[in-house]
C-alpha cells in the first residue's frame, strides 16, 4: 500500500460526520489524483464484466448507482475508492502504521495547524500515530485544563453502517500532555503492534470505569516477528539495569531526573532512586556517554542483556524432543515420511548459533521406541532402536544417548531420519500411547527443559492419558455439545502443570481424518506456552497438504523462541493486573510462566483500578525475562503511557474497538470452557446491548432521535465484530461442526495476535475481477504489493460474473461466479471452459499474462503476516469455489460472509434490529 502523505492524519479523521462513505469525500479523494476504481481498468478488465453487464458495476466500481451513507440500513456506504491508498481516512495506512519510525518523512509544515484543530493539541510521542517531531511542536500553549483528548463523534449505526475499511484504521491516538517523556523522542511510547490498550484515555476512578461498561485491558504481543532480524529493537548490552527499589519497574522514557541528574523518580510509584554510577559511562569506548542517547530513555521497547542475578541456573541449551506417531494411521497418511523429511531439510534452520542445540526422537505406537544416535565419525554410525512396552512406568533405557547435540551428530541424525520411514512402513499397529510417550519425554528433558513437539494422526488410546471416541453427532448443536469441548481425562491438565514447573513446553501438530479429541490434547500447549496446530483430513498424497505442512513446520523449527521465560506487567500506583488470558501457567497472581516463549501469540491482561489515579498519565510496563536461543539471558521491556480522564466522553472517544473485540474473544473462550457455548454467545449479545444502552443513556442524552442506534464512530465496528464472533467456527450454533474443528478454533480465538484475530473473526474479501489498476503490483514508494480495497462480507457485494478472494488468515477461498466470462477463466486458470474448472484445495497455475500474475500476487500478499506486523507460521490453503459447484464447499465459503443469514444465525440487518429493540 502507498505510504501515507506526510505520515499524519488527513483532515477527514474519525470526525467529520460526512467523512464516512459520503459521496463528497469519495469524489474529493478521486480528485486527489487516484484513479477511480472499476473505470480505470484496461481493456481486459472491461471484457470481464462487459460481456454480460454494464461496465463498472462490480464491488470496486465507482459510486454510480449506490446509495450514499444516509440510506436505509443495509444500503452500504460506498466502498473506499482507490484514493484511499494515497490518503487513507483516520490516521495512516495500516500497513505503514507499525513500520519503524525512520520510514516516515517529516511532514510539511502546512497541515500541522489543521491537525491541531482536528485532534486538539497533540503532544503525542508515538511515531505510529503522529509525525516524528518534538512533542511540543503541535501543542497549544498550556492551559490550566489538560490537553484536550480525542473528540467524540457520534454516528447512527442504522443510517451510517459499518464499512470494512474501518478495521484497517489505527487505534484512536494516545494524546499525552507536553513534556511527558524525559526526552522528546518519537519512539518514547509503545507502538500498537506490541501493546494495545482497550482504552487510550484511562478513567481516574473505578466508578467511572464501571459506569462506562467498557473493559480496561491490554493486548500484549511482545514480539512482532518469528526472528529478531525481521523486527530489530534496541538492545542494551552494558548490563546496567536501573530499576525502582520499591516497585521494581525498569527505567523508561517517562521517568523524571532530579538532583542534577543523580536521582530519578519512578513514574509508577513516585519513589526517588539513585542513578547507577555506570549509567552515563560507555564501557565499550571507556569514556563518559551522553545520557540523552541511551535507548532505555528514548525507546518504549528495549531489550536488556541480563546479568547473573537474573538467572536461577546457567542458560540451558535449546532442546527439541520429537514425539512421532508411527501407528498405521500415521504411516498410511504420509505423516511419518513427511515429518522425517521436513525435520531433515530444516536442520540448518533450527537455531544453533551457540552450537549447543540438542535433539531427541521417540516413535510412538502401542509401544515406545527410543533412538540412540551416535556421534559423527563413530565406528558404528547406525542409530539403535530400543523398544519399551511397559506403558505404566516407562523408563529411560540409556538416558545419556537419547538427547544428542545437533552439531556433533548432524550426519547421523540425517541417516536416522532417512531410515525412520522404512522401520515402520509395514506396520499394522493401531495403538497410540502418546500419553505415556509424553511422560517418558518429560523424564528425558525435565533436567534441562525444552520443547516436546508432538506429531500425531491418532487418538491416544493406550497407556497414560488414554482417550475414547466420545463425539456423538446427535449432541452437536445441542446444549450437551459443550461437554465435548471439556477435557476428557484430567491427565492432560495435571501433566501440563508438571511440565511447566520443569520448563518443558509442548506443541501439538494434529493430523487426522478421525476424531482426535483436540479438546483434551490442547490443554498441554495451553498451560505450557505452546500451540495446537490442527490439520483436519490431512494426507500427504495431496501435494497441497504436504507443501502446507512442510512450509509451516520448517518455519516453526526456525523460529527463535525464548526459554525459561516469565512475563509480568507493572503499572502506576492505583492500577492492578487482575486477570491474564493466553497460553501459559499463572504461577502467582501477577506472574505468567512460559517454559518456551513463542513468537506467534498474543496475551490479554485485564486491569483493575483500585485507587483514584491523581496523575495526568498512567504507565503500564510489560517485562519478559527469557533466555534467547543463543543462551543469553535478556529482559524485553515495553512501556505504554496513557492519559487519564474524569470524563466519560473521553473514555468512549479513545476506546479501541479491535482491542476490545480481542478481550471479549478471550472472555468468550473462557466462558465456553466453563459454562458452555450458549452462555458465551448470550454474554456477547448482552455486552453489545449494555454498551449501546450505556452510550445512549450517558452520552446521547437518553433520547433516540428517529429510531436510530447511536454509537461513537471509533466503535462503530464493535457490534459487527461481536456478531462475527458469535458466528465464528468456535462459537456459532450449528449441528454441522465437528468437535475437533470447534476446539481448534477456540485455540485460535484465545492465542492469535490482534491483526490475525480480527481477520479470523471478520475475514478479508477482495473483488478481483475489477480490481484497481495498481492492485497486485508493487507500490512505487514502498515496493509492497498493493491490495484491492476490502469489501463488506455480504452476498450483496458479490456479482454473478465476479471473482473474489475471501481470506480469514487460516483459509482462503477463491470464489468464481456462475456467469464468469470465458476470458476471465482463461486468464486466471488457463482453462477455456468453465466445466473444466476443478474445485477444492489447489494452487493457481502460473500463467504468462498480467492478470494471472496480479491475482497470484494479491493471494500471496494477503497471506503475508510480516506486513501485518505479526509472526505466524500459518500458510492458508486456497480453495477454489464455484458459485454453482460442490454444495458443501460453497456453504463453507458462505459461512465467511458473516453479514448474511446462514446456518441458524441472523444477518447483520436482523442483528442490528434486535440490538435496537433491546436498547
From Swiss-Prot:
Keywords from the UniProt entry: Cytoplasm, Cytoplasmic vesicle, Endoplasmic reticulum, ER-Golgi transport, Golgi apparatus, Membrane, Metal-binding, Protein transport, Transport, Zinc
Domain of life: Eukaryota
Membrane topology, record value: Peripheral membrane protein
Gene designation per UniProt: sec24
Region Zinc finger-like, annotated ranges: 244-269
UniProt feature, compositional bias: Low complexity: 1-38
Entry similarity comment: Belongs to the SEC23/SEC24 family. SEC24 subfamily.
Protein name stated in the entry: Protein transport protein SEC24
Binding site for Zn(2+): 244, 247, 266, 269
UniProt key word Zinc: yes
Lineage: Eukaryota, Fungi, Dikarya, Ascomycota, Pezizomycotina
GO biological process: COPII-coated vesicle cargo loading; intracellular protein transport
